[in-house]
Regions:
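Active-site-adjacent structural elements that line small-molecule/cofactor binding pockets in enzymes
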Residues: 1-270
């Protein structure tokens, strides 16, 4: 099982994120992630949130070995054509270390949705947001592989696209969610599924995702299941009940969240 860190960006400054990523690399962690949010969900005016993609691009130059990714990109914030080029470019900058996490964004009832509402950006219904994730993954693959055929979905359309940057290799697409609908989308259109480590239905969601992936006709061995949890000893140490549960489910990657000011001593525990 790979062990990664997620650097929560709320209230952080890039120099401390860079220092934490380098400490994680030195400590033997496998990857670093960050959130994709526009502001602090608690609306603290002084906090601020560094933009995810800019941060990841800078971290690609600041590290050598770590995989890098957003956990996860809100597909309501970027058109998939723009995202395809962003991801292809970061794949070049990082030397092929990108893991592209995609998510549906927040529901209207969640505090995270207020960042979009404050900018007069639409917060779509659940069905629309789920469709957007599925179609974003399809559009990305078409543009990355040079497929010039037209695409007509419910959320996006392509008119014989050509000439877009093609990453080599294309980054894996990791779809995050907390229910069977998103697990199914992850299996059908993604290369991996991500959810909470303590999700009560973790085994069932992993099964749904894997079965959907097998039904898509793609290689089952290439599909991954990852989870996230807070950085603590019970997740860092092998052999704990928490780690044993993940192993029974077949989790491939554990992503541990840490907040600023980042405890570099804690980061070095592994």
């Amino acid at each position: 099982m790979k062990i990664d860190l997620l650097l929560i960006p709320v209230g952080a400054r890039y120099p401390e994120m860079r220092a934490a990523a380098r400490a994680a690399e030195d400590a033997g962690y496998d990857g670093v992630w960050t959130w994709d949010h526009l502001r602090d969900p608690d609306e603290r005016a002084e906090a601020g949130v560094p933009e995810a993609w800019t941060t990841l691009t800078a971290l690609a130059e600041a590290t050598r070995r770590l995989t890098l990714g957003p956990l996860v990109l809100n597909t309501g914030l970027r058109h998939p054509g723009l995202l395809a080029n962003m991801a292809a470019t970061l794949q070049q900058v990082s030397g092929g270390r990108l893991l592209l996490g995609l998510g549906a964004g927040a529901t209207r009832s969640m505090s995270y949705a207020r960042e979009q509402e404050a900018l007069n950006m639409e917060v779509s219904p659940d069905r629309v947001r789920a469709e957007r994730v599925a179609e974003t993954a399809q559009v990305l693959r078409r543009l990355w592989t040079g497929d010039e055929s037209s695409f007509v979905g419910t959320q996006f359309r392509l008119d014989r696209p050509s000439g877009f940057l093609r990453p080599d290799p294309p980054p894996p697409i990791i779809v995050a969610g907390f229910g069977p609908r998103m697990a199914g989308i992850a299996g059908l259109h993604g290369d991996g599924f991500n959810t909470q480590a303590m999700h009560p239905n973790l085994a069932e969601l992993a099964r749904v995702a894997r079965e959907a992936h097998a039904a898509s006709g793609r290689e089952p061995a290439r599909f991954s299941v990852s989870v996230f949890a807070g950085l603590s000893e019970r997740w860092l140490r092998a052999g704990t009940p928490e780690r044993a549960r993940l192993e029974r489910v077949g989790v491939d990657r554990l992503i541990l969240l840490t907040s600023p000011p980042y405890d570099l001593g804690g980061v070095r525990l592994r």
